[in-house]
């Protein structure tokens, strides 16, 4: 007999609350759950359930490379990465919850001992890095908060096909191959999250998405604003001196400070 996917409608506030609870329970039970984020629909599985992970790998035709972990709250990053790079902290503060996946160095072991003892490093990490995302959709985050173990969630489509923007798209590709689908309507952006890898003081965009590379650079930029209330001319003078000193410290021309992630402004004339 052909299996079918159970569909939960989640359009009203009460339906969304109930769907989040049922989704969390299904994940904890080892089921594959389709759900919306602000970008595209994803398929979630709990990482400490080998059977669920095997089904997800088969579904996505991805036998080895790990899937990104989806977080209920931005501060949950510290469950996985003990030493979050400053650049990543800046992106988290400005762009999470939101359409940004970060690939961060782990440092040899997961920060949360319970996860480490369960052997989840090998499940979640690749070349000592981990992919993390905090979606900007209340239903998704409420569901994730109801699960005690890491939830991974790749896009709800077959490998090589377009990401699903609606529950209808998910069913077209995955009906009968996932256990539960929470239908909360079309996604806000209809495109994938931007993937950025951060290591030390360097970063690079690994996959284009909602945020462009220019927007990521702007999010990372640090701004120095000089305001001299007694004499506005001094603001411009102070800004000029700061540009010169900063350029010397960074060993770059003052005209390249923006490219290095700095913006020096004056509130005076």
Q: Predicted regions span which residues?
A:
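Active-site-adjacent structural elements in enzyme catalytic cores
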Residues: 1-227
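Conserved active-site segments centered on acidic
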Residues: 223-269
């Amino acid at each position: 007999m052909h299996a079918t996917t159970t569909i939960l409608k989640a359009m009203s506030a009460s339906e969304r609350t109930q769907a989040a609870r049922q989704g969390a329970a299904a994940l904890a039970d080892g089921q594959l759950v389709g759900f919306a984020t602000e970008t595209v629909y994803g398929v979630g599985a709990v990482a400490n359930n080998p059977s669920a992970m095997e089904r997800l790998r088969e579904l996505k035709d991805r036998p080895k490379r790990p899937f990104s972990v989806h977080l209920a709250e931005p501060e949950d990053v510290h469950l996985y990465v003990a030493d979050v790079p400053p650049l990543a902290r800046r992106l988290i503060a400005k762009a999470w919850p939101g359409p940004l996946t970060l690939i961060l160095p782990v440092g040899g072991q997961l920060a949360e001992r319970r996860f480490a003892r369960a052997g989840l490093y090998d499940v979640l990490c690749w070349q000592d890095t981990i992919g993390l995302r905090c979606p900007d959709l209340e239903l998704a985050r409420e569901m994730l908060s109801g699960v005690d173990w890491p939830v991974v969630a790749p896009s709800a489509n077959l490998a090589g096909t377009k990401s699903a923007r609606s529950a209808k798209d998910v069913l077209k590709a995955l009906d009968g191959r996932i256990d539960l689908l929470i239908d909360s309507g079309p996604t806000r952006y209809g495109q994938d999250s931007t993937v950025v890898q951060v290591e030390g003081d360097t970063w690079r965009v690994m996959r284009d998405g909602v945020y462009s590379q220019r927007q990521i650079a702007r999010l990372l930029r640090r701004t120095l604003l000089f305001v001299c209330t007694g004499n506005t001319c001094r603001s411009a003078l102070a800004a000029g001196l700061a540009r010169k000193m900063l350029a010397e410290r960074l060993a770059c021309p003052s005209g390249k400070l923006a490219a290095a992630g700095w913006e020096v402004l004056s509130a005076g004339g």
